[in-house]
Amino acid sequence: MSAETPITLNIDPQDLQVQTFTVEKLLEPLIIQVTTLVNCPQNPSSRKKGRSKRASVLLASVEEATWNLLDKGEKIAQEATVLKDELTASLEEVRKESEALKVSAERFTDDPCFLPKREAVVQAARALLAAVTRLLILADMIDVMCLLQHVSAFQRTFESLKNVANKSDLQKTYQKLGKELENLDYLAFKRQQDLKSPNQRDEIAGARASLKENSPLLHSICSACLEHSDVASLKASKDTVCEEIQNALNVISNASQGIQNMTTPPEPQAATLGSALDELENLIVLNPLTVTEEEIRPSLEKRLEAIISGAALLADSSCTRDLHRERIIAECNAIRQALQDLLSEYMNNAGKKERSNTLNIALDNMCKKTRDLRRQLRKAIIDHVSDSFLDTTVPLLVLIEAAKNGREKEIKEYAAIFHEHTSRLVEVANLACSMSTNEDGIKIVKIAANHLETLCPQIINAALALAARPKSQAVKNTMEMYKRTWENHIHVLTEAVDDITSIDDFLAVSESHILEDVNKCIIALRDQDADNLDRAAGAIRGRAARVAHIVTGEMDSYEPGAYTEGVMRNVNFLTSTVIPEFVTQVNVALEALSKSSLNVLDDNQFVDISKKIYDTIHDIRCSVMMIRTPEELEDVSDLEEEHEVRSHTSIQTEGKTDRAKMTQLPEAEKEKIAEQVADFKKVKSKLDAEIEIWDDTSNDIIVLAKNMCMIMMEMTDFTRGKGPLKHTTDVIYAAKMISESGSRMDVLARQIANQCPDPSCKQDLLAYLEQIKFYSHQLKICSQVKAEIQNLGGELIMSALDSVTSLIQAAKNLMNAVVQTVKMSYIASTKIIRIQSPAGPRHPVVMWRMKAPAKKPLIKREKPEETCAAVRRGSAKKKIHPLQVMSEFRGRQIY
């Protein structure tokens, strides 16, 4: 065992490719000096020259850089225990090439205009750089050999550990392995930091993590194998862990030498959906002049069919809801038809310079159908993520519990469930990657998913061993280590998937799923089905906990302020109040069902707390989306269902959302509503003009005015069937938010009014505040907007004109009052400062600072169309004699 195995390198010293930052940094000074010596500009500048360096100085710089490298090389050669002969030969070669460069450079500096001498210097410089590079690569190979020697030492101890015969030897060998792992990890980390290739750095980092994770597992499994050598599953676990350690050692060995490791498996078809849709959108825009059916039709149809195949795989997945499956199929058929229509229009326009209107319409329709398909795919993927990552550890806990009780007959069934659970998590993680553009996040997701796939059979083997020997402490310890490892990896995967998933999409889908689960709870309670009640309640708790966790993590990425405080207030209310109340009511209901005393239970209380948990989730989502742009809100609203799940507590929630009903109003009512909205927008533009000049970082009045304006705009959008508000309850909640903002503005403005010494100004400000209070109350009353169905002459006619008109009018009046309040607050603030500054001003309630102008580039950027503009001939320049200029000079007039 003492004899060391000779280390063989797979690095070619003649290959001059620089792989490390260290070699690159050492070469840089010499490259600069040599380049300065031999470089000659092809087009000399017409500006005045500075004094150039003498040739002797340039030569001395090259020699100094070379001798510095030679000194370092000689020290390395003296200390090296390997490659001594190669290093010595390389040093001699560098000296020889350095002398050759010196001779040719002296000849060149004597006659710098003679081309053959210049070419000789260039050749000598290249030869010197090649020799120095070879020397540095040899020095780098010594570092690699040192690392490989530690890999070999770890390998020998690792082989000894696999074959130990008793626990005493096991403990000694494992302690030795731990020390060697520490040394190996240190050298591997240094090599990882020095490598230029990002892929090789990632490979070494992954291998180091694998060694640290699997070494303790190997010790535990070996200990269990010594006690229970007859358990086949323990031997299988040991073989798997040994294989993982061996693979990690191979990766470190290959990556440190710059050798490519095993090729990554090809991406699944679904993983290319996002990029394939992007490519299709780019390829459908063609020039009719150059279009030929033989070229474009087969290629576009082939690309579309590949996309549809990937979408079909997603639609057929077990986690995809029936509704989304049908919609994906419908969108696939629609986009297929849109492509055929587009191709037909291209053929009709072939040879024409400009596109016809029908062709432009077909293009727009194709783009719309592409977006619709992408939207349905996003819905389905978010559904998968929301469902699959709900209870990530439950199948493992069930498997371990069965193993602890020694139920060998049931263990295979639970193992199959656990394996299916792992496969689903990996599948959903890959699906989440398919529509994401976060490359780093996708890489982390795939690494974490691969770890889970590798870990799954090991955990099943450990559970089988525990079921065979349920009283063995060594086997229990092994199972516990695997459990912790699984939990760590599942946590990493969950966080990684959350990072590449839009929080807005996740919250929209989670809100819909919680509403489904709430309805299931109520049905189960009324059907006296305890199992389904417990299952649905558990899903609600899990989804609510996931929402709280993800939103809390999202808020950590923002600076603390009013926005984060508002969001976290709702999250804390959910976790500290609503969920405990819900759990209490569920336990009461389950106890009543178990005792068959349901007639004593007040189910209305259960319905109320169920609705409360849904409303709180909705409030969290609304507060998160407070800072979103209108475009982002419109995109998220597309994710919401166009129908509402029927509530089992009221018959009135059946059918479409209140917002959707607004789009079905008669055209005459729509025109009148549009007139009211136009008047509202005029007032909104006044408010925008009033508040956009002020910096809102230290002015809460401006912040509140902006907030009220945004919410009122959402309410008016609701009356047109648009925007983020879906139901009348959302509009009522929005009116409540406006009322709260108005109350906060009232407090601030009254403080300003109390400090204002001008009685007329103070009186006007207080009057506008009373208007805000009045119109806020009026808006709350008018917020019960709903489309009523009337039966006229046997025809069903929807109408909502009165309530909509009242709502918009109240919003317009309130916005007018806000405009006047902002104006008068500023005027009152200026009077406070002007009058009281001689005696020392009071601390201002808010700071009225003008907003800094938007940054503009110092240099005007050229537009693409300007760079390709036609070049025109300039006017001829007329030379004027200096004497003529002097004769025309009159001087400055003195008055």
Curated annotation (Swiss-Prot):
Set out the biological process GO terms recorded for this chain's protein: bundle of His cell-Purkinje myocyte adhesion involved in cell communication; cell migration; cell-cell adhesion; regulation of heart rate by cardiac conduction; regulation of ventricular cardiac muscle cell action potential
Q: Does the keyword Electron transport apply?
A: no
User: Where can this protein be found?
Assistant: Cytoplasm, Cytoskeleton; Cell junction, Desmosome
The UniProt transmembrane annotation reads none
GO cellular component terms attached to this protein's record: adherens junction; cytoplasm; cytoskeleton; desmosome; fascia adherens; lamellipodium
Any idea which UniProt keywords this protein has? Answer: Cardiomyopathy, Cell adhesion, Cell junction, Coiled coil, Cytoplasm, Cytoskeleton, Disease variant, Phosphoprotein
Q: Does the keyword Phosphoprotein apply?
A: yes
Chief subcellular site?
cytoplasm
Drop me one GO molecular function for this one: actin filament binding
- What SUPFAM superfamilies does its record include? alpha-catenin/vinculin-like
Q: Where are residues bearing Phosphothreonine located in the sequence?
A: 649
Self-association and partners: Interacts with CTNNB1. Interacts with PKP2.
Q: Which disease is it linked to?
A: Arrhythmogenic right ventricular dysplasia, familial, 13: A congenital heart disease characterized by infiltration of adipose and fibrous tissue into the right ventricle and loss of myocardial cells, resulting in ventricular and supraventricular arrhythmias.
Instruction: State what this protein does.
Output: May be involved in formation of stretch-resistant cell-cell adhesion complexes.
Family under the similarity heading: Belongs to the vinculin/alpha-catenin family.
Q: What is this protein called?
A: Catenin alpha-3
Per the UniProt entry, what species is this protein from, by scientific name?
Homo sapiens
> In the record, what lineage is assigned to the organism producing the protein?
Eukaryota, Metazoa, Chordata, Craniata, Vertebrata
**Gene name, Swiss-Prot/TrEMBL:** CTNNA3
